[in-house]
Amino acid sequence: MGFPIALMIDYVWKSPKPPPGTKRRALDRTHPDNFKYFRNWGFTIYRTYYGPESDESWNTLLQVLTQQTRLALGYHDTDRLRAKDWRWANFYKGDKATYPDLINIMKRLFRLFPREDPDRLAGLDVAGIRKLCLEEGEQAESEKNMVGTRLKFVLVADEAVLKDIANDIFVVKTVGYDWDPIQDSRSWGWMRLATGDLLEFWEMILMADEYSISKYYDIFFKGSEEDLEKHVWWGSASLSRFGDCSRVQTACKDDKFGRFRFDP
């Protein structure tokens, strides 16, 4: 299953503090007038390759990541997951009408924050991105735009990524910039993932933060760092695979075990 939608809403909800000595008033989080109290969630994405014709691949990558992540949120819109969302059952009193609203709020709040600068970013490898993020205060800078910066992951579009996009191979690199090679020795601190799996990855690191476990556990890799350049993330052991919800597929009436169904 995925990370509960109602807990995601808690994560991005930042209601104003009441005046001293007064009790905080509960606000309807699904009311349009209160949308201003939500903060965006997403990733900073660094572009490190500026070769010929790479602009088109870069723009395609940004569009695909945004569209697929929002589509993947549709995985949560099922009776089964709603029934398991204890936070929704308690806080929203089991009001079924609110559940699709919460999913749509998460869709609207997703953002990518691109960083482009050929003079400073061109040719940087993973280690260079980590160094840049630490030296230039990536966490504090990103906090101005979105929640979740304490998760300390960014996306990277390097030469390999953008050339893959040009060949209809849709992957992106995700880099943890607080990775410790001794403490987190089971992984290299970065991973290539299919663009449709970005939501699953975000839910994985959010869950790790929520339960105080290593966010690098689910991106472990036994091979060399060179071999990792050919590997694509297989997903989290703690979550169901739902990246397929972001892909065009054909539903089959006779498929009893498929994810998609025809409406009656």
Sequence positions of predicted segments:
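Extended, charge-biased low-complexity segments
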Residues: M1-A194
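Acidic, proline/glycine-rich low-complexity IDRs
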Residues: G176-P264
